[in-house]
């Protein structure tokens, strides 16, 4: 079968990726925008994208813009990085209002992820961590685990999805795995040593999933939608820890170009199964990317929402703001470093593609 992608399909995939990026960024910035307005802060410009404007319209006090590079967005608030306390400025708003305004962006990303998760869980169901069988010759077969066991914990950590086992094995590269399972309403604890599988180039213990189970109770759908978002957030945090420990190579890091390529691959692989499967697959990407953006923006780094929250929390502790000009310089330096990192990641993405 010829799996080559036509130029027309590539262009369509890029458009789809840009729409997904746009929606996620729009929701994030709208969170900032809404709470800025509620806190009495004047929003100078609300934009999707970066770089020069390609379209804009001026409202009563806010300019709404679409910019050339679809790599981010902004909600520029009056006096945000300046020593400015005039009415309507960011610094003139109550401290709690400023904290809510900054935190709202990531929170709105988590809300978007939850809404998308409802759609996915309602239509696909959940992969409950119930063992349906074993792979011959792999450790789980002789470990004492049994068909029908429901895995509740991995090394003391609660799990709710079968895929959590694979995630843990990848993150811990061959370390012993202690499973707490429920069997006939009793709990058993069993330790298994993973075995490296040359064919799949990964560590495995050799258990088989019972597949996805459709949920009939709407409250169960809501419960597992929350757990889906929680799992995605935890996976993002674990991946960051994995990266900081030096376990990931630079070639494994993806940025916007790599994500566009990944979205294109998702569309192409799901297209033969119909438009609804394509929609479900893209919804998975929106869930993953929106939760990722929420987590990444909460990192305590200059220029990110997390870095700005640190300064606001320090203001709450010391009951006075730190030097705002210094804070502005710190955020500017952080932004410059983030741009350098983005260029590196984009170069890395392009190198992998070509």
Spans of model-derived segments:
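Alpha-helical transmembrane signal-anchor/signal-peptide segments
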Residues: 39-44, 124-141
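N-terminal amphipathic/basic-hydrophobic helices that include classical n-h-c signal peptides
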Residues: 1-11
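Conserved PDZ fold ligand-binding element
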Residues: 140-162, 229
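Functional transmembrane alpha-helices
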Residues: 93, 194-293, 310-333, 348-354
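Small-residue-rich helix-interface/hinge motifs
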Residues: 13-86, 296-304, 309-318
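Internal alpha-helical transmembrane segments
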Residues: 62-65, 69-133, 340
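PDZ-domain C-terminal substructure recognizer with occasional recognition of PDZ-binding tails
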Residues: 146, 152-153, 167-209
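Alpha-helical transmembrane segments of multi-pass membrane proteins
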Residues: 21-25, 76, 109, 113, ...
């Amino acid at each position: 079968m010829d799996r080559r992608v036509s130029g027309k399909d590539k262009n369509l995939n890029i458009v789809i990726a840009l729409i997904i990026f746009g929606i996620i960024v729009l929701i994030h910035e709208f969170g900032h925008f809404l709470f800025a307005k509620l806190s009495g802060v004047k929003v100078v410009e609300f934009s999707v994208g970066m770089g020069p404007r390609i379209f804009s319209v001026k409202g009563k006090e806010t300019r709404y813009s679409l910019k050339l590079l679809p790599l981010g967005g902004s909600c520029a608030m009056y006096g945000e990085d300046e020593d400015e306390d005039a009415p309507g400025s960011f610094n003139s708003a109550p401290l709690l209002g400023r904290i809510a305004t900054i935190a709202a962006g990531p929170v709105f990303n988590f809300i978007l992820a939850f809404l998308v998760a409802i759609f996915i869980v309602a239509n696909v169901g959940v992969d409950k961590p119930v063992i349906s069988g074993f792979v011959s010759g792999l450790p789980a077969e002789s470990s004492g685990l049994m068909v029908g066991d429901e895995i509740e914990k991995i090394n003391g950590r609660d799990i709710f999805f079968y895929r959590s086992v694979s995630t843990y094995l990848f993150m811990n590269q061959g370390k012993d795995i202690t499973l707490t399972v429920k069997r006939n309403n009793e709990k058993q604890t069993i330790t298994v040593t993973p075995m490296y599988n040359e064919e799949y180039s990964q560590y495995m213990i050799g258990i088989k999933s019972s597949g996805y189970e459709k949920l009939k109770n709407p409250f169960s759908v809501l419960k597992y939608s929350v757990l889906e978002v929680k799992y995605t957030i935890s996976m993002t945090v674990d991946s960051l820890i994995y990266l900081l420990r030096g376990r990931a190579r630079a070639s494994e890091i993806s940025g916007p170009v790599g994500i566009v390529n990944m979205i294109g691959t998702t569309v192409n692989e799901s297209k033969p199964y119909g438009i609804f499967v394509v929609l479900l697959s893209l919804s998975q990407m929106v869930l993953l990317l929106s939760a990722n953006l929420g987590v990444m923006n909460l990192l305590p780094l200059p220029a990110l929402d997390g870095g700005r929250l640190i300064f606001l929390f320090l203001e709450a502790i010391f009951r006075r703001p730190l030097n705002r000009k210094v804070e502005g310089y710190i955020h500017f330096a952080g932004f410059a470093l983030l741009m350098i990192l983005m260029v590196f990641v984009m170069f890395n993405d392009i190198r992998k593609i070509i």
